[in-house]
């Protein structure tokens, strides 16, 4: 019997872009599970993340992602991460056990989210909206 394709998406909640992205992927024939890329919407935690203090939140971040990982009962065709701030290479490697393709898209510059550079080597495809970042880091340009 035909099985639908599955996508797991981590995207910041931002002016409902996450919901629109989910709809667009569903329109491509995927069952989509959507999660916020950040483990909390608490303003203090979001500020720590934005300022790059992820080490302080390491246990919270790992716990958040592992909880989601442990709920996956079937293989996932695509893990899509949009504008990552929290997810680490170690977490991506864990998800690789259940996700056959890992795709990352940056809608922000690496100047603002330098930790995302560590994800390039862990991804099957890595895209950016920033032409300077695309050239500097030899990644694919995909404007907004």
Model-derived regions, located:
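Extended catalytic core of nucleotide-activated donor transferases of GT-like folds
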Residues: 10, 19-21, 28, 33-138
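Nucleotide-activated donor-dependent transferases that construct or modify glycoconjugates
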Residues: 3-13
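Short beta-strand->alpha-helix junction loop in the catalytic core
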Residues: 143-144
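Short helix-terminating capping/connector loops at secondary-structure junctions
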Residues: 2-3, 74
């Amino acid at each position: 019997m035909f099985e639908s394709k599955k996508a797991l998406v981590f995207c910041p909640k931002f002016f409902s872009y996450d919901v629109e992205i989910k709809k667009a992927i569903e329109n491509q024939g995927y069952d989509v599970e959507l999660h916020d890329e950040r483990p909390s919407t608490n303003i203090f935690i979001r500020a720590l993340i934005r300022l790059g203090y992820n080490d302080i939140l390491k246990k919270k971040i790992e716990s958040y992602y592992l909880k989601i990982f442990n709920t996956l009962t079937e293989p996932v065709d695509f893990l899509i991460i949009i504008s990552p701030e929290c997810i680490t290479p170690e977490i991506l490697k864990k998800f690789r056990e259940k996700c056959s393709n890992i795709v990352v898209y940056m809608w922000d510059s690496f100047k603002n989210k330098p930790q995302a550079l560590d994800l390039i080597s862990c991804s099957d495809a890595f895209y950016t909206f920033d032409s300077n970042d695309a050239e500097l880091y030899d990644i694919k340009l995909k404007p907004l």
